[in-house]
Design a protein with these regions (language model features):
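Active-site phosphate/pyrophosphate-binding segments
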Residues: 258-262, 266-294, 384-513, 589-606
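Glycine-rich oxoanion-binding loops at beta->alpha junctions
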Residues: 49, 67-84, 272-284, 308-344, ...
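Hydrophobic alpha-helical scaffolding
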Residues: 7-10, 98, 118, 134-137, ...
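Catalytic-loop motifs flanking and including active-site residues across diverse enzymes
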Residues: 124-127, 304, 308, 404-409, ...
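Generic C-terminus detector
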Residues: 225, 540, 553-555, 565-606
């Protein structure tokens, strides 16, 4: 949520700040701004709306001229989207950009008003800026440390002091921030894509570390002023991975990247056709002794966890609880040192998931994180980390990250089933081999694109949709429904097909399309019966089915037959048409597919 960039070097700062912010648009935002040292003063340009609005404003008024600056894209939390609430905030002495939430801003604001300060905006960020100004005594490090001792909440801050025109100061707590290291130029950013065109090398800031960035040096300190020497990280993905590469949207590109993403994710964890998590410190002997397994996540990652629950319980015969992170952490869960907590987060920065992980660690449980971003907060805190190798996922609506998360859940299930004696080596090897073949089947599913586009054309005028399925198909329906509502803005809900008669069927009319999923042979007859129920009440039905399903004429209006795969692995295949239907529905409605309204890619506040 929100994006921060900062630059100091020999080049003009404004174009680099704007370019960096453009690479962070996927994080979601409603306003943008930059601040640049311009002939001894800090000049600020900011406005409500898209980055293009800011560019237009500067084309009319002139860009700030200077070699040091900070920039920000804002996703409103305190105060509505407006020019005045946009970042940067500050005064002639101190200017800042901020991601996160200052929880005690009201108390601090009242104090500052009592000291004679006035406020132009409704934001908590302006409070932090004025507090920095209040305590400033000519020593930025001392001032920042004092302010950190006063504020409560989460933050990533980029700070400029007028008295130090060659420097940017950066600090973080519970909100991601990196320091990019180039040749005679250095950067700060919320995420790697903002700097990847300029450098691959960066430092990860830890909690309450303060970075002092000049064009030829980066120094990092703790709040007591002690210098910290950190390991330099190098981004291991290609610059082109953050570009569309000829596709109309990042989402479509990322759908097409799924076969390769799955290969990169599973192959390092397979040895001699058997799952192998030894590099991650996953101990099979300990694995079989856990009393309970909890999978905790948010949004799409939680839906991947639902697939994990079904397959682990089915083949490993271990009870699994899947919980929404924001619910888990507040319900006093019964988790102990005998349990395993698996958290899933693409960014590794999801605030509620991170808090749930911390709760599990306090209870003494072992923790495993499935994340896509190396060195992220969740990755650094978990006992065991499984990195997915999806590469950068730019579109807000997750596709390839979901697919690789599921692929890891399968390998964990196979490992657990083998450790528990529920699978012998031959059967475990057979399933692992089938998983290795899934990327090719995903390719075949992507080839159904034109059928999915046709189905989407029949959905664009709907006000509401219903997704139904049973078992693994119900878990899939949850993700399909989320994808559609995220980017098409059409209301949709997912329901277990067997629950229709318990109330939901009252909503069925000719105006409500139904997307049904039937990939599990043992449940097909029941699902078809449910489809007939909605069809008899006038629903337009799109059926996504396994290839051998014998379907009577008239049961569904559109049938999308999937390529052949073992039914246990069908979620990885059936997810593709669900993604494509959502994508083309949004495209046909003329929506901004990659940056849907009100959404952020990385939800770093609670």
């Amino acid at each position: 949520m929100c994006g921060i960039v900062g630059f100091t070097g020999k080049q003009q700062a404004a174009p680099i700040l704007l370019d960096g912010l453009s690479k962070l648009e996927y994080r979601g935002y409603d306003s943008a701004g930059i601040a640049v040292f311009d002939h001894g003063n800090i000049k600020v340009k900011k406005c409500k709306g898209r980055l293009a609005n800011l560019v237009e404003k500067m084309d009319e008024e002139g860009k700030p001229q200077g070699h040091v600056g900070i920039g920000h894209t804002r996703w409103a939390t305190h105060g509505e989207p407006s020019d005045i609430n946009s970042h940067p905030h500050g005064n002639k002495r101190v200017t800042i950009v901020h991601n996160g939430i200052i929880e005690n801003y009201k108390k601090l604001k009242d104090f500052l008003v009592g000291e004679g300060y006035s406020f132009a905006s409704e934001t908590d960020t302006e409070v932090a800026a004025k507090l920095l100004d209040y305590y400033y005594d000519g020593d930025p490090m001392k001032t920042i440390a004092k302010v950190l001792s006063e504020i409560k909440g989460s933050y990533a801050l980029g700070i400029m002091f007028r008295d130090f025109p060659d420097e940017i100061f950066a600090v973080r707590k519970d909100s991601p921030l990196i320091v990019g290291v180039g040749e005679h130029e250095n950067f700060i950013a919320s995420d790697v894509p903002a700097i990847i065109h300029y450098t691959r090398d960066y430092y990860l800031l830890d909690q309450n570390e303060i970075a002092v960035i000049k064009k030829d040096s980066v120094k990092i300190y703790d709040v007591h002023g002690n210098e910290i020497h950190k390991e330099l990280n190098t981004a291991d993905w290609d610059v082109d991975a953050a570009e569309k590469g000829g596709y109309a949207h990042f989402m479509l590109k990322e759908i097409h990247e799924q076969p390769d993403s799955v290969k990169r994710t599973i192959m390092p964890r397979i040895m001699d056709d058997m799952p192998d998590f030894s590099a991650e410190g996953f101990n099979p002997d300990k694995l079989k002794n856990y009393k309970n397994i909890y999978i905790v996540a948010c949004g799409t990652a939680m839906h991947a966890g639902m697939v994990g629950k079904y397959i682990i319980e089915k083949i490993a015969r271990v009870s699994v609880t899947v919980d929404i992170a924001s619910e888990f952490r507040y319900r006093d869960p019964l988790i102990s040192e005998d349990d395993l907590m698996i958290v899933i987060s693409q960014s590794g920065e999801t605030a509620d998931t991170k808090a749930a992980l911390e709760l599990a660690k306090q209870a003494g449980a072992d923790t495993m994180a499935i994340v896509n971003v190396k060195g992220s907060s969740i990755a650094r805190e978990a006992d065991m980390v499984v990195y997915t190798h999806a590469g950068p996922e730019i579109s807000v609506a997750s596709t390839k990250a979901y697919m690789v998360q599921i692929s890891i859940m399968y390998l964990i299930a196979f490992e657990l089933a083998y450790a528990n004696g529920k699978m012998d080596e031959a059967e475990c090897s057979r399933y692992t081999k089938m998983l290795e073949e899934v990327p090719e089947v995903i390719e075949e599913a992507i080839a159904l694109e034109s059928k999915c586009q046709f189905a989407a054309s029949k959905l664009i005028n709907a006000d509401s949709l219903l997704y139904i399925g049973r078992g693994l198909d119900y878990a899939l329906s949850m993700e399909g429904s989320l994808k559609l509502k995220e980017i098409s803005y059409i209301h949709s809900e997912s329901y277990a097909a067997g629950e229709l008669k318990h109330g939901t069927i009252s909503l069925i009319t000719e105006q409500m399309p139904v997307i049904a999923i039937a990939t599990q042979k043992n449940l097909e007859e029941k699902t078809i019966s449910n489809i007939k129920e909605v069809k008899s009440r006038g629903a337009f039905v799109v059926l996504i089915a396994e290839p051998e399903l014998d379907i009577e004429d008239g049961v569904a209006d559109i049938v999308i037959k999937l390529p052949q795969a073992d039914q246990l692995l069908m979620p990885m295949v059936a997810a593709v048409p669900l993604q494509l239907i959502a994508y083309y529905t949004a495209v046909l409605k003329g929506n901004d597919v990659d940056k849907p309204r009100n959404l952020a890619k990385s939800v770093t506040v609670e």
